[in-house]
């Protein structure tokens, strides 16, 4: 019995030159899809196109564009349809961040992260829907994060952007359902992933930035995006047991999680190596303009290539059971590590 494979589709991916977006390009290419790959860095884009062609893409084109520019995004969507045909799937993955305490982030930096990591999703989804809705078909996949539910220290700008995406996506999904269209939008909440962003992110930390363990390979994330594109009726997917644990712990005991992250969230986001003073910085200019970093970061030896939770979550109804089991393990552990402080004695009235 042969495996069912969908007919080749036209797929647009933002942030496609590295990390999760790059891995998504390879995954869709292996299905024989037609790909429009959007990013700012020329070398990274060229590498992504060559990799997609080797993986089996029917056709792959590189489009240099900044998702913070709505006109550039609209032009990219127009070119994708002119060269590849009607867009069937649009994947939003482009983002930027700043690793620093909130008081050390400038207004310009905060605005830039918000424009790329939140408004970039808004502009790109708008460009996709302007084409999908008149045809009555199409899927938009938003690459999210556990940080969409649970902000973490040293990433206030990125945490705010991911929370904004979550609220906007929920509202948009309701509107699409109310309209009766077959166009769907779904979200994939990611764990920590081994991507190049930790080498090129703007950082004021004393040591090199790293994803909070456990770390997963970008191919895990790409498989989840591929599955979500094929099954967009579900509002969102959670990837990795750590994502499930974070979301459940935050829902059940957010105060405990505050204290836990206050104790662990600073060291866990840094390696033991000092941060290089002359490292690349992609906040305002692409770090991969002249160098192709690929999909993987520097944490291959630590990263996991499989996610048993992800495989289980594809089965209907299993996510709730997994969440209940995870909550049973996580909450007692948080309480042991972060005992509540004894409240001060109440004062009577004079």
List where the protein language model places each region.
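Residue(s) in the substrate-gating loop at a strand-loop-helix junction
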Residues: 145
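Conserved glycine-rich Rossmann-like NAD(P)H-binding loop of the short-chain dehydrogenase/reductase
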Residues: 31-47
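SDR active-site lid
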Residues: 177-275
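The beta1-alpha1 cofactor-binding region of Rossmann-like NAD(H)/NADP(H)-dependent oxidoreductases
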Residues: 65-75, 107
């Amino acid at each position: 019995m042969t495996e069912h494979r969908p007919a080749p589709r036209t797929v647009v991916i933002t942030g496609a030159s590295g990390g999760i977006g790059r891995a998504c390009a390879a995954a869709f290419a292996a299905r024989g899809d037609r790909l429009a790959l959007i990013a700012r860095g020329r070398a990274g884009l060229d590498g992504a196109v060559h990799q997609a062609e080797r993986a089996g893409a029917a056709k792959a084109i590189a489009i240099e564009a900044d998702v913070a520019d709505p006109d550039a995004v609209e032009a990219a969507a127009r070119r994708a349809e002119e060269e590849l045909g009607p867009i069937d799937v649009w994947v939003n993955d482009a983002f930027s961040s700043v690793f620093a305490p909130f008081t050390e982030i400038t207004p310009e930096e905060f605005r830039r992260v918000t424009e790329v990591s939140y408004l970039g999703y808004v502009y790109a989804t708008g460009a996709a829907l302007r084409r999908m809705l008149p045809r009555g078909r199409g899927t938009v996949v938003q690459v999210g994060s556990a940080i969409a539910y649970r902000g973490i220290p040293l990433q206030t700008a990125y945490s705010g952007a991911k929370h904004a995406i979550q609220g906007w996506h929920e509202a948009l999904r309701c509107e699409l359902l109310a309209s009766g269209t077959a166009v769907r939008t779904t979200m994939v909440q990611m764990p920590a992933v081994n991507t190049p962003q930790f080498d090129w992110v703007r950082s004021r930390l004393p040591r090199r930035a790293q994803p909070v363990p456990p770390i997963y390979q970008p191919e895990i994330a790409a498989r989840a995006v591929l599955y979500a594109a094929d099954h967009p009726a579900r509002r969102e997917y959670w990837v990795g047991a750590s994502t499930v644990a974070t979301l459940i712990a935050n829902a059940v005991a957010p105060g405990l999680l505050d204290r836990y992250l206050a104790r662990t969230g600073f060291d866990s986001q840094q390696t033991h190596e000092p941060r290089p003073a002359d490292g690349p910085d992609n906040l305002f200019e692409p770090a991969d303009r002249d160098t192709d970093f690929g999909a993987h970061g520097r944490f291959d030896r630590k990263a996991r290539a499989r996610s048993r939770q992800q495989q289980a979550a594809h089965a209907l109804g299993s996510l709730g059971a997994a969440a209940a089991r995870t909550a049973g393990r996580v909450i007692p552990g948080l309480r042991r590590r972060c005992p509540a402080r004894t409240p001060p004695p109440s004062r009577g009235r004079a």
